[in-house]
């Protein structure tokens, strides 16, 4: 049996609101296999983004554990956690978070350079991915010179450039029109098939959610497979 790309066990996370502690995640369990696509749906404020941040090592759970390729986040220091995030995970958000002063090519190269890849190789990898997402003619354009759909495609290329085991996506089509949203969906599937990347997608878009292998619902801090 293959090793899970991401696994979490009994994850609990809460926040303080004045004198009260609000428990957002209550014993969440999840396991993602290589190449699997899952969607996480739920009402606004249900903790979907919090769960994504915990799975990506951006936030620490109050209890429970998260593993990425059998590495437990709790056993890693900050530098090693950063390496796992940079080399084994990719992140895409509703608001692309591209660096405005850099071109599309430079934005996609950035994770490679941070990982210590030589500039020439980073450039080659970034150009190849931007070509795959249909932006070979926009390499030297800065984010302000790109459309919303183009910026999101740059963000997806950036998330994939280090060939991560899993890409975590928070409302990736939330800011896009129907045509661009469908284009992003197709692109995700195509690139995943080529690279065997797993995807965890937090979304309100039920059309997007229903294209995934499995849909989970987060409600009252508890994560369940849709229909259970």
Swiss-Prot record:
What protein name is recorded for this chain?
A: Lipoprotein-releasing system ATP-binding protein LolD
Principal localization reads membrane
Q: Look up the EC number in the record and give it.
A: 7.6.2.-
Gene name as annotated: lolD
Sum up the protein's function in the record's words.
Answer: Part of the ABC transporter complex LolCDE involved in the translocation of mature outer membrane-directed lipoproteins, from the inner membrane to the periplasmic chaperone, LolA. Responsible for the formation of the LolA-lipoprotein complex in an ATP-dependent manner.
Which residues lie in coiled coils? none
The protein's organism comes out as Saccharophagus degradans (strain 2-40 / ATCC 43961 / DSM 17024)
Query: SUPFAM superfamilies this protein is in?
Result: P-loop containing nucleoside triphosphate hydrolases
How is this protein organized at the quaternary level?
The complex is composed of two ATP-binding proteins (LolD) and two transmembrane proteins (LolC and LolE).
Positions contributing to ATP binding: 42-49
Specify the domain of life of the species encoding this protein: Bacteria
């Amino acid at each position: 049996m293959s090793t899970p790309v991401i696994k979490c066990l009994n994850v609990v996370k809460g926040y303080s609101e004045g004198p009260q502690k609000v428990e957002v995640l209550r014993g969440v369990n999840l396991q993602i296999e290589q190449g699997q696509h899952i969607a996480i749906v739920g009402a606004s404020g249900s903790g979907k983004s919090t769960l994504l941040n915990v799975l990506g090592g951006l936030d620490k759970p109050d209890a429970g554990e998260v593993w990425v390729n059998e590495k437990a986040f709790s056993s890693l220091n900050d530098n090693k956690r950063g390496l796992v995030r940079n080399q084994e995970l990719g992140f895409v958000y509703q608001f692309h978070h591209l660096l405005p002063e850099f071109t599309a090519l430079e934005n996609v190269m950035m994770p490679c350079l941070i990982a210590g890849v030589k500039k020439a190789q980073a450039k080659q990898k970034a150009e190849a991915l931007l070509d795959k997402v249909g932006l070979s003619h926009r390499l030297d354009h800065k984010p302000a010179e790109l459309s919303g759909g183009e910026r999101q495609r740059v963000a997806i290329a950036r998330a994939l450039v280090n060939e991560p085991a899993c890409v975590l996506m928070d409302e990736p089509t939330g800011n896009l029109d129907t045509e661009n949203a469908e284009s992003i969906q197709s692109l995700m599937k195509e690139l995943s098939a080529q690279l065997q990347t797993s995807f965890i997608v937090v979304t309100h878009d039920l059309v997007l959610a229903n294209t995934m292998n499995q849909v989970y619902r987060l409600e009252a801090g508890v994560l369940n497979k849709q229909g259970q």
